[in-house]
Structure formats: structure tokens, C-alpha cells
């Protein structure tokens, strides 16, 4: 009887421990970007965002390397016609810590990014939080956000290294009263005004711009260009 009670106690403890760990693990979404996980991700295909985007999203420009990295490509299908790449989550996510290991593309007139987004196409207001690399100078990173379509919160940070030369970890902690951006675990910028609140998709893309030379520089048509991503992690509150 004593042995049975002891066994029951140990079993109950083990179950409780497993349950606790599982509950904790359930708040964390981490994915190595080594293959196309169709249950979690989707590829943009066959359309253009228009506006400042001077390219068409193509699923064929979203690929995976032999060493297990997501590779987004910017290519040319014909003279002055460009194809770009976007990879995005099928689910939406809210407040929490968003992290990515990535290596942006380097060239004037282009953007490599990691961000959250939702908008009218999803039946919501336009809320967005950005980590963007302007290819004209990959020794810097730009942070920004939109709340109900209102942006203008750009903050450009000098990194002290060329981001296009290797993988680094970039992150933002999104909370009801603030957004904090990090580079390799070091806090770089904090915003507290008019913080977005609508859950959105996790997105990564590479594209070339038009009509925004003062921001991106003039795109010279160079291609193919590639941005690479190693892993993505989301930790909810």
C-alpha cells in the first residue's frame, strides 16, 4: 500500500511537471526556417502591393537552402519587371516577444524586413511593427510602427557591423504600453506613444521600391539579390 501511494505521488508529480512544462511551451512558438511548413506559413504569390512596391510577389522566390535557411529572392522576369518574395504566418499573434535570426540583402533601393502586420484585407485596422533593413546601408537598421494606419515613428540605429555579412538576432517586445527593439539581446530603442493593439501575422519579405529614392535610394536593377532567415521565435505574455 505504501509503495502504491509512493508510486501515485511520483506519477502525479511527474504529470504535473509535464503539464506545467507543456503549458509553458504552449506560449512559445519557435521554428527553424529550414523547410516549407505549410501548416504554419504561406508564400505570397501572383500579385503586387502597388504603391512604393515595384515588384510582384512570387512563391518561386521563396526557397530553402541546403544548410537549412529561408532564402527570399529579388529577381527580374523581364526588362524593368521584378519579382520579389514574402513569407508569412498563417496564424495571427498579439502582445509578446518577437525574435528573428536573419541576414538582409545589400543593394540600394531595396528592403529586407521582419514585421507583424494586419489591415483592411484581414478585416481590421492597419497595425504594424517593423524591423527593416534598407539595402543602401546595412550597417544600420530601421524600426517603425503603425497604429490604425498612422506611422511616422521611424528610428534608424547604427549597428556597429554590416548586417548583410552574417546572421544576427533582432527582436521587438510588444506590450500594451510600449515596444522595445533589441539587437543581439541589447535594447536599442523604446516607443511608448500610440502603441498598436491588433494581433497580426508574422511576416518576412524582400522587395524593391519605386518613388521613394529619398528613403531607399534609387534601385539600379541589380539582381538576383537574397535575404536569408535562420529561425523565428514568438513568446506570448
From Swiss-Prot:
Effect noted on mutating residue 128 to D/N/A/L/P/R/H/C/S/Y: Loss of activity
GO MF terms, alphabetically ordered: licheninase activity
Its EC number(s): 3.2.1.73
Cysteine disulfide partners in this protein: 55-84
InterPro entries: Beta-glucanase/XTH, Beta_glucanase, ConA-like_dom_sf, GH16, GH16_AS
Keyword match Iron-sulfur: no
GO biological process: carbohydrate metabolic process
Keywords, sorted A to Z: Disulfide bond, Glycosidase, Hydrolase, Signal
Segment forming the signal sequence: 1-23
Catalytic activity field: Hydrolysis of (1->4)-beta-D-glucosidic linkages in beta-D-glucans containing (1->3)- and (1->4)-bonds
One Pfam assignment: Glyco_hydro_16
Enzyme class: hydrolase
Disulfide bond keyword on record: yes
Family label: Belongs to the glycosyl hydrolase 16 family.
Miscellaneous comment: Beta-glucanases of Bacillus have a substrate range similar to lichenase of germinating barley.
Full protein name: Beta-glucanase
Lineage of source species: Bacteria, Bacillati, Bacillota, Bacilli, Bacillales
Amino acid at each position: 500500500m505504501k509503495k502504491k501511494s509512493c508510486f501515485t505521488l511520483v506519477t502525479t508529480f511527474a504529470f504535473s511537471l509535464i503539464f506545467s512544462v507543456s503549458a509553458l511551451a504552449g506560449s512559445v512558438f519557435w521554428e527553424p526556417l529550414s523547410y516549407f511548413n505549410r501548416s504554419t506559413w504561406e508564400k505570397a504569390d501572383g500579385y503586387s502591393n502597388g504603391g512604393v512596391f515595384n515588384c510582384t510577389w512570387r512563391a518561386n522566390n521563396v526557397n530553402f537552402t541546403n544548410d537549412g535557411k529561408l532564402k527570399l529572392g529579388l529577381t527580374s522576369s523581364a526588362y524593368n519587371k521584378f519579382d520579389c518574395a514574402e513569407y508569412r504566418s498563417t496564424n495571427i499573434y498579439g502582445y509578446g516577444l518577437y525574435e528573428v535570426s536573419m541576414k538582409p540583402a545589400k543593394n540600394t533601393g531595396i528592403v529586407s524586413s521582419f514585421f507583424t502586420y494586419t489591415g483592411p484585407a484581414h478585416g481590421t485596422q492597419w497595425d504594424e511593427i517593423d524591423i527593416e533593413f534598407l539595402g543602401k546601408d546595412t550597417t544600420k537598421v530601421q524600426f517603425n510602427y503603425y497604429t490604425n494606419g498612422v506611422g511616422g515613428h521611424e528610428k534608424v540605429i547604427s549597428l556597429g557591423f554590416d548586417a548583410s555579412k552574417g546572421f544576427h538576432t533582432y527582436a521587438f517586445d510588444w506590450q500594451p504600453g510600449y515596444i522595445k527593439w533589441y539587437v543581439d539581446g541589447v535594447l536599442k530603442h523604446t516607443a511608448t506613444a500610440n502603441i498598436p493593439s491588433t494581433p497580426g501575422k508574422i511576416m518576412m519579405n524582400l522587395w524593391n521600391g519605386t518613388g521613394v529614392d529619398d528613403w531607399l535610394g534609387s534601385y539600379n536593377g541589380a539582381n538576383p539579390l537574397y535575404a536569408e532567415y535562420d529561425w523565428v521565435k514568438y513568446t506570448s505574455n
